C-alpha cells in the first residue's frame, strides 16, 4: 500500500501565499501604506505583536515571517478623532467601503476598507502617552519592550478574560513565547537598591481578599525558602530582598506581621468588592485612584491598606500554607511594572523588586525540576498543581454574578436595552452597572454622506478615565 507524500505544513508560508493571492491584495497593501504614513505623521505609538516584532528586528530577531502583512495597533491620546481622520483620508484616496467602528475593547476604534481591518487605534491618556519609553523602527515609534511586558503578564493574571476565546486557551502559549524573547533581547538590568524595612501588622479577612504588593513578595520569598529547605538544596547567595513574615489566623481573619519597605508601608490587597470589604473592616476611604490603562485597576485607599479592585474580573491567585490567598506571581510582576511606570521617582525600587520576583520564579523552577526527578509523574503533577510558582487557572471568584461581566458585555447589554426601549428591572444584578452608551464614540462611514461626529469628550465617560489619577475622598 503506497503512503501519502509528505506535506510541508509551514502555516506561515501558506498564509503569506494566501495574502498575496487575495483578490484585493493590491488595494489592501496600498491602504496599509496610507496607514503607515499616517502613523508617522501623527507620531502615534505602535504596540502589540507588531511592536514586539519591530523591536526584535532591531536585535536581529522577529516573531513574524518576513513579508507578512502588518497588523497596525497604535496608541493615541486622541484616538477617536485620529480614527475619523484616517477614515476620511482613505476615502478621499478612493478606497471603498471605508468605516470607523468602536471595537469590543471600548477604548479602541477600528478602521477598515473593503471590509478588511487596516488599523486599530487605542486610547492612551496624554499624561502617559507623553512619558512612556519608545523605540524607533523605520521612522515608526514603537512602545518599548519594558512597557510591552505588562500586556503579556496581563493574560496570565486573568485566564478567563475574553470569552468565548478565553486567554488561557488563546494567549498563554503565544504570550509566554513572546515574553521569553523580550527577556532574552531586552532584559531589565538588575540594579540593587538599598531598602530599609519596618515591621507592620495587619488584620485582614481570610476569604475575600488576596495579599498583593510588597507583602505578597515577602510571602512568596519565604515560601520559596521553605521549599528549598524541603528539597535540601544549598542556601542561595542573593542581593535581592529577603523580607520575613509571621501570621496567625482564625475562622475569619489573618493577622499578618510582615517586613515592609519604609517608603511603601501600606498593605496592598486585591478584592472583587473593595467598598464592601472596607465597610466590613470598619475602615474609612481616604483616596480613590482611577485605572492606569489596563495595567492597574481602580484603587481604593484607606490609611494603612490599599485595595485593588478586581470587580468584573476573575484574578488568578496562589495558595500558600494554611490556604492563605496571595496574588499570582504574574500579577505581582505586573504590580511592580505598574509602580515603575506610575511613580518615576521610585522606578529603580520597583524594577529591583520586579527582577527579584523573576529570580524567585527561576529558583522555584530549578527546585521543581529537582522534585520532578525524585517523584512519580502523578505525584509531581499533584505537587505542581498546588505550587504558587506556576501559571494557574485558580481564581478569586466573586459570589455575585455581576462580578464576572466584562465592560464589553455590559456595553452590549446596554445597546440591547436602548434598542428595545425597555429598561432592566431594578432587581436585575446589572441594573446599576450599565454604562451610558450615549457618551461613547460613534461609528463613522465617510461614504454615506453623513457629517463626521464631533466633540467626543474623554472627561465625560468614566470608561476613559484610565490615566491613574488619584482623588481625595471626601467624607
From Swiss-Prot:
Catalyzed reactions per annotation: RNA(n) + ATP = RNA(n)-3'-adenine ribonucleotide + diphosphate
Organism from which the protein derives: African swine fever virus (isolate Tick/Malawi/Lil 20-1/1983) (ASFV)
Top-rank taxon: Viruses
Record-linked InterPro entries: PolyA_pol_cat_su
Description of what induces expression: Expressed in the late phase of the viral replicative cycle.
Pfam family, one: Poly_A_pol_cat
Example of a GO cellular component annotation carried by this entry: virion component
CDD domains from the UniProt entry: polyA_pol_Asfar
EC numbers, comma separated: 2.7.7.19
Subcellular compartments: Virion
Similarity comment: Belongs to the poxviridae poly(A) polymerase catalytic subunit family. Highly divergent.
Protein's name according to its UniProt entry: Putative poly(A) polymerase catalytic subunit
Alphabetical UniProt keywords: ATP-binding, Late protein, mRNA processing, Nucleotide-binding, Transcription, Transferase, Virion
Primary localisation category: virion
Gene Ontology BP annotations: mRNA processing
Function according to Swiss-Prot or TrEMBL: Polymerase that creates the 3'-poly(A) tail of mRNA's.
A single MF term (Gene Ontology): ATP binding
Enzyme superclass (EC): transferase
Amino acid at each position: 500500500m503506497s503512503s501519502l507524500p509528505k506535506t510541508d505544513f509551514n502555516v506561515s508560508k501558506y498564509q503569506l501565499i494566501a495574502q498575496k493571492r487575495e483578490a484585493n491584495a493590491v488595494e489592501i497593501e496600498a491602504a496599509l501604506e496610507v496607514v503607515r504614513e499616517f502613523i508617522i505623521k501623527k507620531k502615534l505609538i505602535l504596540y502589540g505583536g507588531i511592536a514586539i516584532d519591530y523591536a526584535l528586528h532591531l536585535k536581529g530577531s522577529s516573531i513574524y515571517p518576513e513579508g507578512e502583512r502588518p497588523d497596525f495597533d497604535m496608541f493615541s491620546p486622541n484616538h477617536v478623532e485620529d480614527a475619523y481622520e484616517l477614515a476620511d483620508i482613505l476615502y478621499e484616496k478612493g478606497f471603498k467601503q471605508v468605516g470607523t467602528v468602536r471595537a469590543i475593547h471600548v477604548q479602541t476604534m477600528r478602521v477598515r476598507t473593503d471590509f478588511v481591518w487596516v488599523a486599530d487605534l487605542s486610547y492612551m491618556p496624554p499624561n502617559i502617552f507623553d512619558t512612556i519609553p519608545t523605540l524607533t523602527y523605520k521612522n515608526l515609534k514603537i512602545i518599548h519592550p519594558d512597557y510591552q511586558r505588562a500586556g503579556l503578564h496581563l493574560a496570565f493574571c486573568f485566564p478567563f478574560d475574553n470569552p468565548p476565546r478565553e486567554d488561557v486557551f488563546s494567549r498563554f502559549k503565544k504570550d509566554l513565547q513572546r515574553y521569553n524573547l523580550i527577556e532574552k533581547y531586552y532584559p531589565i538590568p538588575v540594579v540593587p537598591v538599598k531598602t530599609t524595612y519596618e515591621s507592620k501588622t495587619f488584620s485582614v479577612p481570610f476569604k475575600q481578599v488576596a495579599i498583593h504588593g510588597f507583602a505578597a513578595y515577602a510571602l512568596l520569598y519565604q515560601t520559596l525558602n521553605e521549599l528549598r529547605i524541603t528539597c535540601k538544596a544549598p542556601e542561595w547567595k542573593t542581593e535581592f530582598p529577603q523580607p520575613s513574615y509571621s501570621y496567625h489566623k482564625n475562622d475569619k481573619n489573618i493577622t499578618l506581621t510582615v517586613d515592609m519597605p519604609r517608603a511603601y508601608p501600606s498593605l496592598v490587597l486585591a478584592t472583587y468588592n473593595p467598598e464592601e470589604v472596607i465597610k466590613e473592616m470598619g475602615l474609612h476611604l481616604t483616596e480613590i485612584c482611577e485605572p492606569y490603562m489596563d495595567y492597574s485597576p481602580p484603587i481604593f485607599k484607606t490609611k494603612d491598606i490599599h485595595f485593588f479592585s478586581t470587580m468584573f474580573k476573575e484574578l488568578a491567585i496562589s495558595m500558600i500554607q494554611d490556604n492563605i490567598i496571595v496574588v499570582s506571581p504574574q500579577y505581582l510582576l505586573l504590580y511592580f511594572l505598574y509602580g515603575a511606570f506610575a511613580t518615576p521617582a521610585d522606578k529603580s525600587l520597583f524594577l529591583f523588586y520586579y527582577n527579584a520576583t523573576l529570580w524567585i520564579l527561576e529558583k522555584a523552577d530549578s527546585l521543581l525540576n529537582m522534585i520532578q526527578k525524585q517523584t512519580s509523574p502523578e505525584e509531581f503533577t499533584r505537587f505542581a498543581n498546588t505550587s504558587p510558582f506556576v501559571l494557574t487557572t485558580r481564581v478569586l471568584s466573586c459570589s455575585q454574578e455581576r462580578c464576572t461581566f466584562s465592560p464589553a458585555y455590559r456595553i452590549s447589554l446596554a445597546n440591547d436595552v436602548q434598542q428595545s426601549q425597555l429598561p432592566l428591572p431594578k432587581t436585575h444584578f446589572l441594573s446599576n452597572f450599565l454604562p451610558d452608551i450615549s457618551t461613547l464614540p460613534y461609528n463613522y462611514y465617510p461614504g454615506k454622506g453623513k457629517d463626521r461626529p464631533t466633540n467626543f469628550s474623554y472627561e465625560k465617560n468614566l470608561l476613559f478615565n484610565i490615566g491613574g489619577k488619584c482623588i481625595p475622598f471626601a467624607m
